Amino acid sequence: MIKRTHWRPLFIIAPLCLASSLTLATGQAADSVAPEAASALQTKKLAHAQHFMISTANPVASKIGYDILKAGGSAADAYVAVQMALGLVEPQSSGLGGGAFAVYYDAKKHKLTTFDARETAPLEATPELFQDSNGKPLKFYDAVVGGRSVGTPGTVKLLGELHDRYGEMPWKDLLAPATTLAQDGFIVSPRLAGELADSKKSLARYPQTKAYFFNPDGTTRQAGQRLKNIPYAETLLMLSTYGADSFYTGQIGKDIVSKVHGATDNPGVLSDKDITSYKVKERTPVCLPYKGYDVCGMGPPSSGALTVGQILGITSHFDLTKMGPKSPEAWQIIGDASRLAFADRGRYMADTDFVPMPQGLLDADYLKARAKLITPGKALKTAEPGNPAWRHPIAEADDQSIEFPCTSHISIIDKEGNAISVTTTIEHGFGSTLMTHGFLLNNELTDFSFKSYQDGRPIANRVEPGKRPRSSMSPTIVMKEGKPYLVVGSPGGSRIIGYVAKTLIATLDWGMNIQQAISLPNSVNRFGKFELEKGTSAVQLKQPLEKMGFKVSVSDMNSGIQGIEIRNGQLTGGADPRREGLVLGD
């Protein structure tokens, strides 16, 4: 069984959960602010195992995945079972009505690949989807709740394809645990109860959603209550009988479309054709050589691997190892590298099936030139997009869209050495708040830029029919000598990129074990202001960073990093102390 090594993180006090903020500047989609509050901080212990390991954001889901792995299931099998459970016990973060990105290592073929199951804009969507009759961007709250923001879900299609390719156990056996849990009821966790209370107004807007998440006395479901979801159980029974494709070709798909159009206060344009024609796209991993490792992740429409790769590539020109994690100068360099990477992200990164993108964003000479813009000990005055190599350059405008994901991450390694890193989402907390067949529908389309043009130039991440919105999700597998060394990822809006970069630097540069790296206080700089994690030793960086010329804020940081590391043939795992996650293995 699993063994644990105790390690106490550098947290001073436990921050309180914060309510989601829905007051955003017009013209922004949902990227800078993350709606899912951090849970009270907990002390987490490094987990040890020999044969297999799983790390998820919810203990119930982790136990279900563990049981699948224990029974001989593959990493893909375990993910299928876990995702079905998360859609029930963590509905604010992911589910059947959302999308995901997966990085998968096939041990038999020694092959690393990625799968894009991002939600997709309807064929009837126009660049004016989130603009009023005068062409002005809608306020975020006016866009997110209802049918307008719903894209074609991709998660169920991903589950089916992963099982078809990599599954070992019968499909119906993987859906059975979540089906039973939905029938018998699960215990509402403190985190879910807090999210329900924070989202009370939006959840009360539609009768079906209100009936499920509210008690008869008008209060939201409380921690410790047992909550049954019979429609969800019926959905899983149908999927277990007819397969994943039936979600798209049968009654469920038709009812998703009806629900989107039936939200008469904010209807969408999703069609039956959008549902039936959805495809998961297998894409080549984006990899960056770093300190003897290959850091690999998801390419566009995710900006994750490119932006994380740029941060690492720029910081590699400084001796972070010598500086160490307590050095304000080290964090200044990481922060300015992040600002430069985010500048390129805002200018260039989007769905490359629709817009051309520079080929040289991870070119070694380009990153070396970007690193020369950074002066240790002095804040970079401005971070402008660079001029990487192009094949077919076009003039794009900077995008200030914001990503507001309520998201979850799963890391799994099975006994055969197969590994999967999946970040899964419905975007905002509880998505669009529309509910059908026991699950919530995403609001993923608000990850597009609400504006189409800026200063007469097109924005790469603008709405277009059939396009997939840009994401910051960064599921990562670090390879060493051709085999997985680290499996990691996180939720958290566009801060995901900083959370993952921090964890990689902490393990690969500073020699921390995976739990220490995850628990390391968060310090993030995306757009010029340093954000330091409240109640942790990161606050000690405030004065030194201000002296360097930065504006600094202190706030709760809602990462949910789940990671597994392989050292000397042994599996070690970590879960984020800011959430309810659990690592299990044998």
Predicted regions and their residues:
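Active-site rim segments in enzyme catalytic domains, especially the processed small/beta chain
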Residues: 88-95, 99-114, 131, 266-271, ...
